[in-house]
Amino acid sequence: MNQNERKTVARRMILLIAVACVIMGLYVMRLIFLQLVNGDDFKAKATNTTDYNFTVTAARGDIVDSAGRRIATTTTSYNVVLNKLLMGDRDLDTMLQQIVELLRANGESWNDTLLIGQADAAGNYAFTDDDTSTSDQKQLADMKETLGLQQYATANDVMEMLVEKNDLQDFSPEWQRVLAGIHYEMDRQAFSNVNNFVMAENVSTLAVATIKEHSLQLPGVEIVETSARSYDQSDIIPAVLGRVGKITAEKWKVTDSNGQVTYPLREKGYNMNDVLGISGLESVYEDELRGKDGVKTITRNSDGVIVDTKLTTVPEPGHTVQLTIDSNFQRAVDKVLADNIDMINRVYNTGTMKAAAGAVVVLDVKDGSVLAASNYPSYDQNLYAANYSEYSSDPSLPLFNRALQGLYTPGSTFKPAVAVAALDSGLINQYSTVYCNGVYNYFKDYHPRCTRHGHSGNIDVVTAIKWSCNIFFYDVGRRLTSDVYDAYAYKLGLGQRTGVEVSEAVGRLTTKSDSNYMASLDVQAAIGQGNTVVSPIQLATYAATLANNGTRYRTHFVKAILDTNTGEVLSETKPEVMDVIEGTGNTFELVRQGMKQVPSTISGKISSYPVPIACKTGTPQRSETYAPGKHYLNAMMVAYLPADDPQIAIGISIEYGGYGARTGDLVVDIANAYFALKDGSLAQQAEAEKEAEQTQQEDQAQTTDPAQAAAGQTTGNAAAQPAQMTPAADTAAPETAAEGEAQPAVQDEQQPAADTEQNPDAIAPEN
């Protein structure tokens, strides 16, 4: 390159550098201008963000048995949730149609509580509410009020308003109804930038996968993990545990007598779509089980861009509620109750009304805690929703909590209460006698009877309890009057609340204020007939009070409240004395002596059981007759054992069970299960049965031969039978005319009826 060429290149380089410097200078000047002149404006814009807080539902606390085994727990489920912040400008109704189609394809439904069905062929709509449902009627009224419609508005009026309000005119009638229902739900849940909309709940994993596959087409549609209630041991006291459910319209919006509207659950932090306890222990301990919800915060800038998502408050799970019940013992009592009813039907009720239902309650004598509360028949908690129609239409009433709400005439189980009253009041002592010749002749036109089974002549209180002498208690009851023996019966736990945490029937005793009262009614009520009705849990409480020499503890199901994370005991149920009969002299010892001798009068296992049992049978009449003057009978029993150092008390009722003595083997089976619980063998047996069941299920899963599967099931069940709990049904001794229980007195025209309108022996709960 010559010199001229070099000079040309140099000049060009200088020019290029100069241009670059000018451009750089212009950029620097612009940056200085932006930073110094408009810096505050840009800073404000950069920091102009908005936080949106969303609730993260806390897991519900577990319910466990006395050994810590889970009964009710929380499992993961999946909800389809719409987040308005993330939806952008996508057409909402088009997106809703797509979600509905995806849900339908996977057999799923979506939330729709609009009480209007699809249009008929003429294009008309009709309400689908239940005329008898208060909740439905309130929801309809609230819906019409919210839409600005009169209460006489028709379903067509409501749909017309919803279609117009939500711009659904261009959709087919079918889609108008679907989308109107979803929009209605959105309004109910207050769908907004700060409130997500739960469109579908508890969807399958297949539906989850399908929706996630279409996530790019569905902005703002999220799959949210949430908690669902499930029951690991769904057969354990389902009627006592109760249920959880969605918040109803009448609980969410409360209108008082002055027309003032309040939202008490919202004030407590609930959202309308939340689940809460609606019955039983799930409801009573809602505050403990519920937990504290967390908060998720989404931050969006002024351009609508999500710049941050974080969990600002971690949800805290609810506390654990620990029961006094051991699930293995409860299951054992359930089984022996069913076995006893089966035995009664096979051995005794072969040609008469079958025993179809019953209840047993077992208490810890020392503190009133419930060890078992069995109902037969019962139901599976996990199948409640799916089988509700079947359960509710079953004439044997499996949903009915007989143990706590069944009311039964106690029959002769009431006699120890009369004995306590007579002894403690000084009316009689251990040497006092009443002459029994089989007929009570005090009244001119009323002569109730006694079978004199095992006794006659002069009878003292111990012998009267042993042989259930009606004449003795007729006379003592007449002399005491119902005013006196009722006062003692109340203190012993009959005809009043036991104190359990959940709903129970109160029952009643026969009183002088009864509309059918006459002096002879005191005589009938003294043997547990008349108008008196009590529940099985009252019978068990009564037996425990007799065992405790007159001290009655509050009956309870809950042992403690525990911290879910640490297991720390937050609160514990202490023994609470509800009432005391001081018991002058040897009142309770004499009653105990009589009750200890009752087993010797009963055929079957109880008469030779090595552990002394104090018990009293009852054979109350039912209103139904199987022949003129012949009433069907219930079988009743109260017991405690060991008689000289009581640990457990038992109350039993078997509908149409016949004589109370037929429950003697049931008492023994319960005792065997209790002692097996104490020595650990019951837990070992339960574990062995569980393993055998699992093995059987695995074997059945591997076999393709139905005959082999059936044979395997039979073998497995037979192997799992606990030997000590199999009633000696087929070898039971022939039933005697009285079998340890005096037959009901023969009625004549002047005798007050044992069953009246005020004294139903039906099992309906008291309101």
Residue map of PLM features:
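Beta-lactam-recognizing serine transpeptidase/beta-lactamase-like catalytic domain environment
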Residues: 70-72, 78, 299-316, 325, ...
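Solvent-exposed, polar/charged alpha-helical surfaces in well-ordered, non-transmembrane soluble domains
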Residues: 90-101, 209, 213, 238-242, ...
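Structural motif corresponding to the C-terminal cap of alpha-helices
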Residues: 336-348, 426, 599
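Ligand-site clamp/hinge motif
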Residues: 654-657
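Long, low-complexity, intrinsically disordered segments
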Residues: 716-767
